[in-house]
Amino acid sequence: MDQSNYSSLHGFILLGFSNHPKMEMILSGVVAIFYLITLVGNTAIILASLLDSQLHTPMYFFLRNLSFLDLCFTTSIIPQMLVNLWGPDKTISYVGCIIQLYVYMWLGSVECLLLAVMSYDRFTAICKPLHYFVVMNPHLCLKMIIMIWSISLANSVVLCTLTLNLPTCGNNILDHFLCELPALVKIACVDTTTVEMSVFALGIIIVLTPLILILISYGYIAKAVLRTKSKASQRKAMNTCGSHLTVVSMFYGTIIYMYLQPGNRASKDQGKFLTLFYTVITPSLNPLIYTLRNKDMKDALKKLMRFHHKSTKIKRNCKS
């Protein structure tokens, strides 16, 4: 049998944390809890911002998109991850691995670009408040979202296709708990310099360029906030922007460390825990970060809870 086709016939073995079975049991519980928090928190943000007409603004339009993205991102990874952590079966089919890799890279790229667009939205709202709704009109917001998803899809197709075309010479064991690009590059039996440099180059475009734009936007925002005499306005701007900067720091920090190192020098276990952080923990914290100091979102969530309570009460009365 041609060894280069072995993986396509038999799939991949995901080692995960199989060297630490007790850790796997603990991690499976932790991951399941964070996944539940992600599902509940992000779904609540989407519903609350849709039901409250006061939140039908560009800022919350992008926040809904981020919440939807986090739901998709985690769902593309965590169910399979839990199967890997819980049971003895550590395999994933070749087709399953391909789908996971393409979707994972696509959605990860979308988040990088979406965070940059959200910073531009805050820049426009704070630095050009009189022109905010003219500049950030619904048509432009929709075009931005379509462009983000399209560019990210192209990035995913290029990187994943390059990686999957690398021959593995029969090696189908991935020292990871998901089909991640660095793990697949490591099992190749040929020189991977071209692929690694492609990842690095596209990483600069998809990761570093948006990050630079975010930092520039917040430089102007900080300047505008310091000029504002109203303490209440300063506090509101700092709360909103502080939430976004926290999310940016958590997400970009791990992504840069993982993908923008030529040769990917992160150790095996270090790489796994970093992946756990930005695929499991960060999406679950986003709803908390964005609502903790946001009075409008808190009020919208209270309305959603009252609406749910009333609808439940009506259903009970109808049944009785």
UniProtKB/Swiss-Prot annotation:
GO terms for molecular function: G protein-coupled receptor activity; olfactory receptor activity. Disulfide bonds join C97-C189. It is found in: Cell membrane. Its main location: membrane. It is a multi-pass membrane protein. It comes from the Eukaryota. One of its GO terms (biological process) is detection of chemical stimulus involved in sensory perception of smell. The chain crosses the membrane at residues 26-49, 58-79, 101-120, 140-158, 196-219, 237-259, 273-292. Keywords: Cell membrane, Disulfide bond, G-protein coupled receptor, Glycoprotein, Membrane, Olfaction, Receptor, Sensory transduction, Transducer, Transmembrane, Transmembrane helix. Residues 50-57, 121-139, 220-236, 293-320 are cytoplasmic. One of its GO terms (cellular component) is plasma membrane. Odorant receptor. Belongs to the G-protein coupled receptor 1 family. PANTHER family: OLFACTORY RECEPTOR. This is Olfactory receptor 2W1. It comes from Homo sapiens. The lineage of its organism: Eukaryota, Metazoa, Chordata, Craniata, Vertebrata.
